[in-house]
Amino acid sequence: PSQVLYFLGAMMAGVVPVLLHEYLKEEDIAALLRERPIGGFLSDTCFDGLKMQPAGELWQMTGKETGADADFGVLTSGTSGLAKVLFRKEASWRDFFPVQNDIFHIDSHAVLYLSGSMAFTGNLNMLMAFLYAGGTIAGTEAVQPKTWMKDIGETQATHVYMIPSKLSALCRVRGKASSVTHILTGSQLMTKRILDALTRHFPMSRTILYYGASELSYVSYIEGKDILTHPSAVGRPFPGISIIIRDGEIYVDTPFAVDGAERPLTCHDMGRVDEEGMLYFLGRREDQYHIKGNHVSRQKVLSHLLMLPGVEEAEVIGEKQANGDDRLIAFLSGQVSASDARLMSLLAGRLRAWEIPHRILRVASIPKTSTGKTDRKRLLAMVKAVSLG
């Protein structure tokens, strides 16, 4: 709650607030300052190496001018994993709230439950959308699924907002909440196991998966069983949003983007739109592999891996070969009882021959970086360790 109070208080005082992740190290903040100057920090941590001057109990000033004609800033990790600040006008969110609240069925009777820091753009936006509608907000920063389930029941939450990996953890604990009518999620692909488990835990709910970015806000959404019947699809555009595909890249024309954004804008995600207007997210350009003269989308392969029985998490990486081709290695976690041969057979019914991974490795969990992204270096190390063994 204190994050939100300070954020709103700073805006009312005419300051341009930016919420930072608590896990950011001093060197990360130094890199952030080089990229986009920030005038001061409200923090209970002293950053000795950044040469800032105390300006009150919690304030530390950098002596720099932000130079942004904006109302607030949001963070994005970008392609490098390093935090970057993007600036927004209040209207870029406020004017879209009626649209997203209609799609997500948010009104003054809705009760939101969410988990994590408000420095995550999705959390902050969803919280502000509920405030705009006059709804009720509950949540915690604790990573404790048992606490989540208990809180959801006690608060009679109608909406749960979490990324799929958190929903997966939530569904592994006991409990049922019939008050929940909507599960809102994005940023990652869903699995059949998670969707089935959500139905058991929240029998009155429907799931809405969205695609968006800090730069763009919401772009498209897909609901319920369509998530299963259209692997790698991220739905149709929100009202007022246009999607254009240029050379395989997704371009979005939206009036609700960050300050200074071109129209249309691309985040360099790859995709396609089918004849029904459904957008398929195929990953980033650097996530395209080359196998026997064919381009293979990591996202497409990953979406089908996640639909295999018993899979909780999955990842796929390309191992470069001497001839320049990539060899796909799949990683699966969960209670996957089927043999590798059976899994390969299931994939053969859904993927082309060159899209099927060369090898499947079963792991306890998919390693993550501090920002929650897959740690591909550790996955490559696992491959080398298995090869040497």
Residue ranges, per PLM feature:
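Flexible, low-complexity linker/hinge segments
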Residues: C46-D71, D95-F97
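Conserved AMP-binding A3 loop
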Residues: D71-P98
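Conserved AMP-binding/adenylation subdomain of ANL enzymes
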Residues: R94-V111, M118-H159
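Gly/Ser/Thr-rich phosphate-binding loop
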Residues: H159, C171-T229
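Conserved AMP-binding/adenylate-forming
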Residues: P1-Y23, S115-S117, H295
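Adenylate-forming AMP-binding core of the ANL superfamily, especially NRPS adenylation
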Residues: L189, D196, L209-Y210, S220-R263
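AMP-binding/adenylate-forming catalytic domain of the ANL superfamily
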Residues: L351-T374
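AMP-binding/adenylate-forming catalytic core of the ANL superfamily
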Residues: H268-E355
